[in-house]
UniProtKB/Swiss-Prot annotation:
Ranges where the record places region Disordered: 1-20
Name of the featured protein: Small ribosomal subunit protein bS20
Domain of life of the organism encoding this protein: Bacteria
Keywords: Ribonucleoprotein, Ribosomal protein, RNA-binding, rRNA-binding
InterPro entries: Ribosomal_bS20, Ribosomal_bS20_sf
Lineage, highest ranks first: Bacteria, Pseudomonadati, Chlamydiota, Chlamydiia, Chlamydiales
Length: 98
């Protein structure tokens, strides 16, 4: 491991703000990817509930899809239109099965 760079007073060396932004962007990318994966998993569970045809699991799955889509918009991961499109398509599929 390389030795840490320090200033004359012994504290850690300051980073330029471009480096800070790169680090922040990398952290947010990983967090956003995990949330997108969670959203896709919830949608797959909803699709499985539709194939099974159980009404209670369909309604609970639809609630999960709504919740995840709204949280993604709140966090800035999905845009409003994408969440609306996801919820609309899920509702249409649920109404056909119920």
């Amino acid at each position: 491991m390389a030795p840490k760079k320090t200033t004359k007073k012994g504290g850690p060396q300051k980073r330029p703000s471009a480096e800070k932004r790169i680090l922040t962007a990398q952290k947010r990318y990983l967090i956003n990817q995990s949330f997108k994966s969670k959203a896709k998993t919830m949608m797959k569970k909803f699709e499985a509930a539709l194939k099974a045809g159980d009404q209670s699991s369909i309604t609970s799955g639809l609630q999960l899809v709504y919740s995840v889509a709204d949280k993604a918009v709140k966090r800035g991961i999905f845009k409003n239109n994408k969440a609306a499109r996801i919820k609309s398509r899920a509702t249409l599929r649920a109404n056909v099965k119920i």
